[in-house]
Amino acid sequence: MTPGERSLIQRALKTLDRHLHEPGVAFTSTRAAREWLILNMAGLEREEFRVLYLNNQNQLIAGETLFTGTINRTEVHPREVIKRALYHNAAAVVLAHNHPSGEVTPSKADRLITERLVQALGLVDIRVPDHLIVGGNQVFSFAEHGLL
């Protein structure tokens, strides 16, 4: 990637980030959210598991990488996800991780951890509107495929 391309991507990320923090902009199901995730996660060489913390209006409070793994897996600990969601006083969280292979189809492990997280977060009244998998320039939505 050339320095000019890196600069362009950084400017695009800043623009999308500003847009996602504007009052009234809901984070879930927005094109900007998907673009932001693709720009942030598509080129990663290792799996990363990120959590996007939302308020009651599904507006972005904060987002962070909680876990980093290897080229084909990362270990996710529900306790840590809950702890950070409570720290941010989130009403909801969007889960996101990448597949460095570019294949966005969820694995059995992806489905199982999603179920565990939805159940665990539900115990403390935190909704999970979606879990997104980024692979290359594609995004798979658990919600859109009826898996939540």
Curated annotation (Swiss-Prot):
Keyword annotations: Hydrolase, Metal-binding, Metalloprotease, Protease, Zinc
What the record says about family reads: Belongs to the UPF0758 family.
In terms of Pfam families, this protein maps to:
RadC
- The MPN domain is annotated at 26-148
- Could you confirm whether the keyword Metal-binding appears in this record? yes
Please give the InterPro entries that the UniProt record associates with this protein.
MPN, RadC_JAB, UPF0758, UPF0758_CS
Which residues are involved in binding Zn(2+)? Answer: 97, 99, 110
Q: Which GO terms fall under biological process for this protein?
A: proteolysis
Q: Name one GO molecular function term.
A: metal ion binding
PROSITE patterns the record matches: MPN (PS50249), UPF0758 (PS01302)
Short motif JAMM motif, span:
97-110
What name does this protein carry?
UPF0758 protein YeeS
Q: Which gene encodes it?
A: yeeS
Q: Determine if Hydrolase is one of this entry's keywords.
A: yes
